[in-house]
Amino acid sequence: MKTYVGCCGYCLARSKYYTVFNVVELQETFYDIPDIDKLKRYRYEAPESFAFSLKAWQAVTHPLDLPTWRKAKNVPDKSLSNRYGFLRPTKEVFEAWEKVVEAAEILNAKVVVIQTPPSFGIAKKTIEML
């Protein structure tokens, strides 16, 4: 088993961070559609052995009326609010997930954190959606 130690986000300049830690969890991917060029730059700058994990974009997990969307630069059309979040099996959630997968592939990430809000709850229906 290999142990990874890192932070949620870069707490130091990236060049320094890569010499101190061997993993980072990218939280910025939660708030907005991942910036592909930025992710490519992260992967290029990091040592080959450096590991990335990222949070899935909130369009997959969080309905549009939750406060986490206040930090987002790109908010989907509010008229489609019942089509986003809660891991719903909708075209919009699947398209959002494809963007997460693309980001993970660019980073060669081994882990994608799917963080659901407390309102997702534990019920038979939500467990089945997993």
Residue map of PLM features:
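Residues lining hydrophobic/aromatic ligand-binding pockets adjacent to catalytic sites
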Residues: M1-L130
